[in-house]
């Protein structure tokens, strides 16, 4: 099977890391990048140097208006309107929509005008079907041309919830994600009309915020629809977040049994998506962690046989970007 030919729209945190992950995994080939706000030389600089994930180990050059990574040429465009991007000209059948702007199906479909055949939105979508690797990607059918990879938090929470629900049953649950700073936040207090707290300085505050990540689990696991909700605290760290899930179980169990269940899933059915650790870890230990979810056995607690708090770590940048690449590989296999 030929590897999928991919274009990336939006060369921000996720766009750049999707390119890195694609090169590492070698399951898809990035042939084009579109970003109207970054010129070619700056694009090369931003890809080469990364404050969180380190300097790119391969070669990065520019030549004849193209970005050359490890000797491979990538066509560069700078269009604001997705309908104007000539994806077919570069040979891109799949598009990673990582601007954070075109998350609605109708807007993402504009990529088809330029020749794209499939669009994978690297964000939650209100109307495009959402798929989480390890959880519901088996529900994907080839007639779906615009899909969402959900959010980084949903990618951590859903595998955890799936394992627990299948073994014990979840009656209801509340999630808090302690979430690293992202590009939408302000370095110092600034205007944020829709979210006043979100406009406060990221480096100086713990900021309560909303998240649809827990409710989105109900979209990828319909049997849990309406049983989970949650919120976020944005904290002054550059990467790695942690899910704190408090659930009421349908059947009685012990925390030792929960640990054994999570460990077994990490070694078998969820291998590569879910990991398990009993070590005394902190957030920086998970920078560049490829798994969607790392269950922290030592951090969870149990109040009684049906009520517990479970903790799982995730690199909200690198883990998520790897799942975008994995989802494209899965979609391509079924075409």
UniProtKB/Swiss-Prot annotation:
<comment type="subunit">
    <text>Homotetramer.</text>
</comment>
<keyword id="KW-0324">Glycolysis</keyword>
<keyword id="KW-0560">Oxidoreductase</keyword>
<feature type="site" description="Activates thiol group during catalysis">
    <location>
        <position position="179"/>
    </location>
</feature>
<keyword id="KW-0963">Cytoplasm</keyword>
<dbReference type="Pfam" id="PF00044">
    <property type="entry name" value="Gp_dh_N"/>
</dbReference>
<dbReference type="GO" id="GO:0006006">
    <property type="term" value="P:glucose metabolic process"/>
</dbReference>
<dbReference type="GO" id="GO:0005829">
    <property type="term" value="C:cytosol"/>
</dbReference>
<dbReference type="InterPro" id="IPR020830">
    <property type="entry name" value="GlycerAld_3-P_DH_AS"/>
</dbReference>
<dbReference type="InterPro" id="IPR006424">
    <property type="entry name" value="Glyceraldehyde-3-P_DH_1"/>
</dbReference>
<keyword id="KW-0520">NAD</keyword>
<comment type="similarity">
    <text>Belongs to the glyceraldehyde-3-phosphate dehydrogenase family.</text>
</comment>
<dbReference type="InterPro" id="IPR020829">
    <property type="entry name" value="GlycerAld_3-P_DH_cat"/>
</dbReference>
<feature type="binding site">
    <location>
        <position position="80"/>
    </location>
    <ligand>
        <name>NAD(+)</name>
    </ligand>
</feature>
<dbReference type="InterPro" id="IPR020831">
    <property type="entry name" value="GlycerAld/Erythrose_P_DH"/>
</dbReference>
<feature type="binding site">
    <location>
        <begin position="211"/>
        <end position="212"/>
    </location>
    <ligand>
        <name>D-glyceraldehyde 3-phosphate</name>
    </ligand>
</feature>
<feature type="binding site">
    <location>
        <begin position="151"/>
        <end position="153"/>
    </location>
    <ligand>
        <name>D-glyceraldehyde 3-phosphate</name>
    </ligand>
</feature>
<feature type="binding site">
    <location>
        <position position="316"/>
    </location>
    <ligand>
        <name>NAD(+)</name>
    </ligand>
</feature>
<feature type="active site" description="Nucleophile">
    <location>
        <position position="152"/>
    </location>
</feature>
<comment type="pathway">
    <text>Carbohydrate degradation; glycolysis; pyruvate from D-glyceraldehyde 3-phosphate: step 1/5.</text>
</comment>
<feature type="binding site">
    <location>
        <begin position="13"/>
        <end position="14"/>
    </location>
    <ligand>
        <name>NAD(+)</name>
    </ligand>
</feature>
<dbReference type="GO" id="GO:0006096">
    <property type="term" value="P:glycolytic process"/>
</dbReference>
<dbReference type="GO" id="GO:0004365">
    <property type="term" value="F:glyceraldehyde-3-phosphate dehydrogenase (NAD+) (phosphorylating) activity"/>
</dbReference>
<dbReference type="GO" id="GO:0051287">
    <property type="term" value="F:NAD binding"/>
</dbReference>
<dbReference type="GO" id="GO:0050661">
    <property type="term" value="F:NADP binding"/>
</dbReference>
<feature type="binding site">
    <location>
        <position position="234"/>
    </location>
    <ligand>
        <name>D-glyceraldehyde 3-phosphate</name>
    </ligand>
</feature>
<feature type="binding site">
    <location>
        <position position="35"/>
    </location>
    <ligand>
        <name>NAD(+)</name>
    </ligand>
</feature>
<protein>
    <recommendedName>
        <fullName>Glyceraldehyde-3-phosphate dehydrogenase, cytosolic</fullName>
        <ecNumber>1.2.1.12</ecNumber>
    </recommendedName>
</protein>
<dbReference type="InterPro" id="IPR020828">
    <property type="entry name" value="GlycerAld_3-P_DH_NAD(P)-bd"/>
</dbReference>
<dbReference type="InterPro" id="IPR036291">
    <property type="entry name" value="NAD(P)-bd_dom_sf"/>
</dbReference>
<feature type="binding site">
    <location>
        <position position="182"/>
    </location>
    <ligand>
        <name>D-glyceraldehyde 3-phosphate</name>
    </ligand>
</feature>
<dbReference type="Pfam" id="PF02800">
    <property type="entry name" value="Gp_dh_C"/>
</dbReference>
């Amino acid at each position: 099977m030929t590897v999928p030919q991919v274009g990336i729209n939006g060369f921000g945190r996720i766009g750049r890391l999707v390119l890195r992950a694609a090169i590492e995994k070698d399951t898809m080939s990035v042939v084009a990048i579109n970003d109207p706000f970054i010129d070619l030389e700056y694009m090369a600089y931003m890809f080469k140097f990364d404050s969180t994930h380190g300097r790119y180990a391969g070669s990065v050059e520019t030549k004849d208006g193209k970005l050359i990574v490890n000797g491979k040429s990538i066509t560069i465009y700078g269009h604001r309107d997705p309908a104007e991007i000539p994806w077919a000209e570069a040979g891109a059948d799949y598009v990673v929509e990582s601007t954070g702007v075109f998350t609605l199906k109708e807007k993402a479909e504009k990529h088809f005008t330029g020749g794209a055949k499939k669009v994978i939105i690297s964000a939650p979508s209100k109307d495009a079907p959402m798929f989480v690797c390890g959880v519901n990607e088996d529900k994907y059918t080839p007639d779906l041309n615009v899909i969402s990879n959900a959010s980084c938090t949903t990618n951590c929470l859903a595998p955890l919830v799936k394992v627990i629900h299948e073994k014990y049953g979840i009656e209801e649950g509340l999630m808090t994600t302690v979430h690293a700073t992202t590009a939408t936040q302000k370095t110092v207090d600034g205007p944020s009309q829709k979210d006043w707290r979100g406009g406060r300085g990221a480096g100086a505050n713990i900021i309560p915020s909303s998240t649809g990540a827990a409710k989105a689990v109900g979209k990828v696991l319909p049997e849990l629809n309406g049983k989970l909700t949650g919120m976020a605290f944005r904290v002054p760290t550059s990467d790695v977040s942690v899910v704190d899930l408090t659930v009421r179980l349908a059947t009685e169990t012990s925390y030792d049994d929960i640990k054994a269940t999570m460990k077994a899933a990490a070694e078998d059915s969820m291998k590569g998506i879910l990991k398990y650790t009993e070590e005394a870890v902190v957030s920086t230990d998970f920078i560049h962690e490829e798994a969607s979810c790392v269950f922290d056995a030592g951090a969870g607690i149990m109040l009684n046989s049906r009520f517990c708090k479970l903790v799982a770590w995730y690199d909200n940048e690198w883990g998520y970007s790897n799942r975008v690449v994995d989802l494209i590989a899965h979609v391509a296999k079924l075409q």
